[in-house]
């Protein structure tokens, strides 16, 4: 997809459009754009690493809760792993691949159970923060596909971002995020990027040039804002940007490619207060009932939308995770 140079085209986008290697992440510029008190104030940048999640785990082991708020970012991951062991595609194409350490201090004698409400809020807030950052970049169509993907584009939304959240079972969590920013996507691709979507905006749209530094700075600012609010407030914002409510989905108990007798179609009613997906089955033994689904147990495909693939398939920069009550190691 070619994009006409205009006032909305950044030098990073011009490099991508010309087929040149994307410029490396500008750390001083990111710092100048950051409006947080903690999140992102410490940034560890790597040109290439097997996995930012592994580096984050190592930092937590070495520093514990002192590492709270650190962002570990890589231009490329060579062995990224998403939910359920799926591949996390992360080539050096001008996207954002990073892990953020969330390590709040616990009261004396506290344990991981006390952190569950906060972790549920973090899981939901991450998707909202991606949506807010996408809107700030001029992509108003960005919405959340339960549990933690962000899709964007009209009339057929496609996968733009995904997250995964790992909890150590004690006092810390690592949030892994992938956002397609500068990579130019083909029209028939199952994923999209902020740059690709902006190419279709009308000429009169007044949006600033896109940059990875600005997207990450906005994400950190929004996540810090959301995590300082209540779970109810985060749920309300998540629901405001819900892509699936009122749509028909296919519920898969294995994968989209592997049919299972227990699979069924359902109407999405929304998410409950724990982040589970509320649906009304349209066929099968529970037809007509209202039930809740966990992203740890099922995957879903919106039947009216065909551009973004099954939840968790490596179509975009990252794989999603369960938005329900977190569990140790894989949420």
What are these regions (language model features)?
Residues 199-264, 304-313, 326-330:
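Conserved, helical-rich catalytic subdomain that frames metal- and/or nucleotide-binding sites
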Residues 276-282:
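SH3/SH3-like beta-barrel fold
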Residues 285-302:
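A short macromolecule-binding patch
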Residues 170-205:
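Short, acidic (Asp/Glu-rich) active-site segment that either coordinates a divalent metal cofactor
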Residues 126-170, 177-178:
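Acidic (Asp/Glu) carboxylate-rich active-site/surface patches
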Residues 2-136, 203-206, 306-315, 320-331:
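N-terminal lobe of the biotin/lipoate ligase/transferase fold
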């Amino acid at each position: 997809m070619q994009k006409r140079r205009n006032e909305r085209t950044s030098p990073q986008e011009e490099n991508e459009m010309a087929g040149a290697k994307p410029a490396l992440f500008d750390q001083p510029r990111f710092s100048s754009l950051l409006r947080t008190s903690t999140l992102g104030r410490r940034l560890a940048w790597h040109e290439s690493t097997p996995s930012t999640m592994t580096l984050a785990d190592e930092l937590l082991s070495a520093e514990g809760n002192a590492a709270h708020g650190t962002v570990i970012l890589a231009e490329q991951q060579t062995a990224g792993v998403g939910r359920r062991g799926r591949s996390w595609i992360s080539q050096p194409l001008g996207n954002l691949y990073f892990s953020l350490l969330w390590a709040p201090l616990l009261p004396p004698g506290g344990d991981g159970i006390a952190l569950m409400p906060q972790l549920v809020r973090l899981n939901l807030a991450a998707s909202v923060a991606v949506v807010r950052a996408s809107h700030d970049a001029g992509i108003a169509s960005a919405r959340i596909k339960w549990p933690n993907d962000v899709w964007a584009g009209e009339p057929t939304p496609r996968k733009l971002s995904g997250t995964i959240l790992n909890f150590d079972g004690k006092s810390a969590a690592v949030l892994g995020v992938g956002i397609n920013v500068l990579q130019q996507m083909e029209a028939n691709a199952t994923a999209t990027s902020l740059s690709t979507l902006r190419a279709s905006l009308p000429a009169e749209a007044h949006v600033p040039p896109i940059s990875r530094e600005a997207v990450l700075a906005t994400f950190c600012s929004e996540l810090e804002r959301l995590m300082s609010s209540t779970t109810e407030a985060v749920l309300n914002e998540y629901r405001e940007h819900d892509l699936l409510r009122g749509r028909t989905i296919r519920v898969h108990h294995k994968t989209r490619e592997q049919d299972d007798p227990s699979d069924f179609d359902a109407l999405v009613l929304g998410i409950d207060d724990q982040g589970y997906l509320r649906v009304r089955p349209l066929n099968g033994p529970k037809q007509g009932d209202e039930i809740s689904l966990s992203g740890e147990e099922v995957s879903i495909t919106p039947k009216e939308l065909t551009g973004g693939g099954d939840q968790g398939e490596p179509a975009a920069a990252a794989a999603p995770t369960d938005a329900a009550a977190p569990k140790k190691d894989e949420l």
